[in-house]
Design a protein with these regions (language model features):
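Positively charged, proline/Ser/Thr-rich regional signature most characteristic
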Residues: 1-6, 81-152, 156, 202-206
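Thiolate-centered catalytic microenvironments shared by cysteine-dependent enzyme domains
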Residues: 1-86, 103-104, 119, 169-192
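Conserved beta-strand elements of the Class I
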Residues: 10, 90-92, 161
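Short Gly/Pro-enriched loop/turn and capping motifs at secondary-structure junctions
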Residues: 131-134, 168-170, 194
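Short cysteine clusters
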Residues: 164
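Extended hydrophobic/aromatic segments used for targeting, binding, or gating
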Residues: 184-206
C-alpha cells in the first residue's frame, strides 16, 4: 500500500467502528501518524465532497520496520479476570442492550452466534457505542461525551476497560475517552465477548 513508518494514514469505515478499529490497531502496533475521518464517508458525501469510483493506482512497495507495540492500549483475558476479582476498574460494555442483557450473543440484525454463553462481564456498565455519535456518525461534542462517561462512572483518573463482542465497538469508546477527552488509563479488551463468552470457568452476569 506504500505506507512507510512516517506516512500519515487517515481511516474511515462503514459502519464507522471499522475505521476506528483500524486506527486503534495501527496505534497499538506503534504507528502514531494516524487519524480518523469524523463522520466517515456518510458525512463526506452529505457535505458534497468529491468521490471517485475508479480503481486507485498501485503504490510502490516500501520498507516498513515494525515499532514496539503500545501495550498500554490493550488488556488480556487474565488481566480482565483479575480486575473483576479485585474491583476498582470501570468496565464499559459497548454492545447493544440485547447483548448486554443476555438476550443475544450476536449483534442486532445479524445471526445470533459467536459465543456459547450470553451475558456480560460482572460489574460491566452499559454504554452502547452509538450513544457517543450523532445521526451522521460524528462524535458528539466533548461536553456531551464527558457527561455520558461521567454518568457511567468513567472519571478522568479511573482505570477503564472497554469491550464489546469483537472489539470494534470497544475501540469507539477508547477513541472518545483518550483522543477527545484526554483520559490516560483506558484499555481495550480485544478478546471481548467472543473470547469471554466461550471460556470455561469465568464469571458471567445476566
Amino acid at each position: 500500500a506504500g505506507i512507510g513508518r512516517d506516512t500519515r494514514v487517515v481511516f474511515y469505515g462503514a459502519p464507522m467502528q471499522f475505521g476506528v478499529y483500524a486506527w486503534w490497531t495501527f496505534r497499538y502496533c506503534g504507528h502514531k501518524n494516524v487519524a480518523l475521518l469524523d463522520g466517515g464517508r456518510k458525512r463526506w458525501r452529505a457535505e458534497g465532497r468529491p468521490l471517485v469510483t475508479d480503481e486507485p493506482a498501485e503504490h510502490a512497495a516500501v520498507a516498513y520496520a515494525p515499532a514496539a507495540r503500545d501495550e498500554s492500549m490493550r488488556i488480556l483475558r487474565d488481566e480482565v479476570l483479575q480486575a473483576v476479582r479485585r474491583g476498582g476498574s470501570v468496565i464499559l460494555d459497548g454492545r447493544s442492550p440485547e447483548e448486554y442483557s443476555g438476550k443475544r450473543v450476536g449483534g442486532p440484525g445479524g445471526p445470533d452466534v459467536g459465543a456459547v454463553r450470553a451475558g456480560r462481564i460482572p460489574g460491566a456498565r452499559h454504554l452502547h457505542y452509538a450513544e457517543l455519535l450523532d445521526a451522521d456518525e460524528r462524535f458528539k461534542s466533548r461536553d456531551e461525551l464527558r457527561a455520558l462517561f461521567q454518568a457511567h462512572g468513567a472519571a478522568p483518573d479511573a482505570e477503564i476497560i472497554t469491550y464489546c463482542r469483537m472489539s470494534h465497538r470497544a475501540t469507539v469508546l477508547h477513541f472518545a475517552l483518550t483522543q477527545l477527552l484526554g483520559h490516560g488509563k483506558v484499555k481495550v479488551y480485544d478478546g471481548s465477548w467472543t473470547e469471554w463468552g466461550n471460556l470455561v470457568g469465568v464469571p458471567v452476569e445476566r
